[in-house]
Amino acid sequence: MQRNLVVLLFLGMVALSSCGLREKHFQKLVKYAVPEGTLRTIIQTAVHKLGKTQFGCPAYQGYCDDHCQDIKKEEGFCHGFKCKCGIPMGF
C-alpha cells in the first residue's frame, strides 16, 4: 500500500511539474509525505535529477538556443538532456 502511494505521489509530482512548480516545492512535499529512510533519499535524488533536466532540449531543435538567448545572449547547444550556453558539442 505504501509503495502504491509513493508511486502515485511521484507520478503526480511529474504531472504537476509542467505547471511551473519548482523543485523546492516537490522536495518539501516528499519530506512531509514519505517517511525518513532510504526510500525518501531515492525519491529526493530522482526529483533533483528531473528538476535539472530540460526535456525540451532533444525534442525541439531551437529550445536551447532560445533558452540561452534569454539568459546569457549566447548560442545554445543541446548536450543530452541539458542546454549548454556557448559550449559547442565538441567539448
From Swiss-Prot:
<feature type="disulfide bond">
    <location>
        <begin position="57"/>
        <end position="78"/>
    </location>
</feature>
<feature type="signal peptide">
    <location>
        <begin position="1"/>
        <end position="19"/>
    </location>
</feature>
<keyword id="KW-1015">Disulfide bond</keyword>
<keyword id="KW-0732">Signal</keyword>
<dbReference type="GO" id="GO:0090729">
    <property type="term" value="F:toxin activity"/>
</dbReference>
<keyword id="KW-0528">Neurotoxin</keyword>
<keyword id="KW-0632">Potassium channel impairing toxin</keyword>
<feature type="disulfide bond">
    <location>
        <begin position="64"/>
        <end position="83"/>
    </location>
</feature>
<dbReference type="InterPro" id="IPR029237">
    <property type="entry name" value="Long_scorpion_toxin_alpha/beta"/>
</dbReference>
<keyword id="KW-0964">Secreted</keyword>
<keyword id="KW-0800">Toxin</keyword>
<dbReference type="Pfam" id="PF14866">
    <property type="entry name" value="Scorpion_toxin_alpha-beta"/>
</dbReference>
<keyword id="KW-0872">Ion channel impairing toxin</keyword>
<feature type="propeptide">
    <location>
        <begin position="20"/>
        <end position="27"/>
    </location>
</feature>
<comment type="function">
    <text>Inhibits voltage-gated potassium channel.</text>
</comment>
<comment type="similarity">
    <text>Belongs to the long chain scorpion toxin family. Class 1 subfamily.</text>
</comment>
<protein>
    <recommendedName>
        <fullName>Potassium channel toxin BmTXK-beta-2</fullName>
    </recommendedName>
</protein>
<dbReference type="GO" id="GO:0005576">
    <property type="term" value="C:extracellular region"/>
</dbReference>
<feature type="domain" description="BetaSPN-type CS-alpha/beta">
    <location>
        <begin position="54"/>
        <end position="91"/>
    </location>
</feature>
<feature type="disulfide bond">
    <location>
        <begin position="68"/>
        <end position="85"/>
    </location>
</feature>
<dbReference type="GO" id="GO:0015459">
    <property type="term" value="F:potassium channel regulator activity"/>
</dbReference>
